[in-house]
């Protein structure tokens, strides 16, 4: 039997309060239903999952690829040892991984570029659902659609080739998914808002394996939650549609001052800004 939070998300359009309760449950690991009889996945089970993935990329303990695959941006979390790292190339892969995790009651972590400073991109004994292979990019009218695995420098390079801009962060190797779902502060934020303010639609895979496109007209509460209402805890994002602006001349500058002048600088900055 699925828990109430998972059932609520699967019935269509949840209320905003239901969504928030679901987010708390997700953070506590309550979106995994009761385990099937038996122990954890066998070698045959892992092999079956590997065959299911469109990428056929699955890194397991003992394999040559595992050490590199489990590493995150921050070496503070090198002690984490996931049971497996699955590289997903399309939403159906994410659905398959979630089904696998439900079957064997494995903790799940989503990973784009692995920059989480809290270590939320990994977990010992769990399944890492890595979306870094999802890097598609297409330009529409006033918007772009981009895969959740795209890093910022790649995203900005693709935008610049079309003379476009989207407000975002300044670290080139940060993943777009974590940035957008967490807010996204950058040099264009004063003019155009946070990255999350510019999300027009997000494709996510929910805990029951459903692939949903969330926008103001469809699954609007989940759309609201993905734009700052829950830190990405309501599903695994696979694609974003983001509002674009025509690229204009941008002036960047850096200020430095002696510590003794910090109070005056802050006061002057507040008056100017």
Predicted regions and their residues:
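N-terminal secretory signal peptides
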Residues: 1-14
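Loop/turn elements at helix/coil->beta-strand transitions in domains of secreted/extracellular proteins
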Residues: 55, 103-107, 164, 233
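Glycine-rich N-terminal segment of FAD-binding domains in flavoprotein oxidoreductases
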Residues: 61-64, 70-134, 148
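FAD-binding subdomain of flavoenzyme oxidoreductases
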Residues: 162, 167-269
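General beta-strand structural signal in soluble alpha/beta enzymes
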Residues: 59-61, 87, 108-112, 139, ...
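C-terminal segment of N-terminal export signals and the immediately downstream linker at the start
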Residues: 12, 31-62
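N-terminal export leaders
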Residues: 14-31
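Short, structural beta-strand-to-alpha-helix junction motif
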Residues: 142-143, 150-157, 173-175
């Amino acid at each position: 039997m699925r828990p109430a939070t998972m059932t609520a998300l699967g019935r269509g359009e949840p209320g905003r309060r239901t969504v928030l309760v679901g987010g708390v449950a997700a953070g506590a690991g309550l979106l995994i239903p009761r385990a099937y009889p038996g122990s954890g996945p066998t070698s045959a089970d892992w092999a079956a999952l590997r065959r299911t993935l469109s990428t056929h990329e699955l890194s397991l303990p003992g394999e040559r690829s595992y050490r590199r695959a489990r590493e995150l941006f921050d070496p503070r979390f090198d002690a984490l040892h996931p049971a497996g790292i699955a590289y997903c190339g399309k939403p159906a892969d994410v659905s398959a991984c979630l089904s696998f995790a439900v079957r064997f009651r494995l903790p799940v972590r989503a990973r784009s570029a692995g920059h989480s400073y809290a270590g939320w991109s990994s977990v010992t004994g769990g399944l890492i659902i890595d979306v870094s292979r999802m890097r598609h990019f297409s330009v529409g009218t006033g918007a772009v659609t981009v895969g959740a695995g795209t890093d910022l420098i790649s995203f900005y390079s693709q935008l610049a080739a079309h003379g476009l801009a989207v407000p975002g962060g300044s670290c080139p190797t940060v993943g777009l998914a974590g940035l957008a779902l967490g807010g996204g502060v950058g040099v264009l934020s004063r003019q155009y808002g946070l990255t999350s303010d510019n999300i027009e639609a997000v494709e996510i895979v929910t805990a029951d394996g459903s692939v949903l496109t969330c926008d103001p007209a469809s699954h609007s509460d989940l759309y609201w939650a993905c734009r700052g209402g829950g830190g990405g805890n309501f599903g695994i994002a696979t694609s974003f549609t983001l509002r674009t602006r025509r690229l204009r001349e941008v002036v960047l500058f850096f200020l430095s001052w002696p510590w003794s002048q910090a109070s005056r600088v802050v006061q002057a900055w507040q008056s100017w800004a």
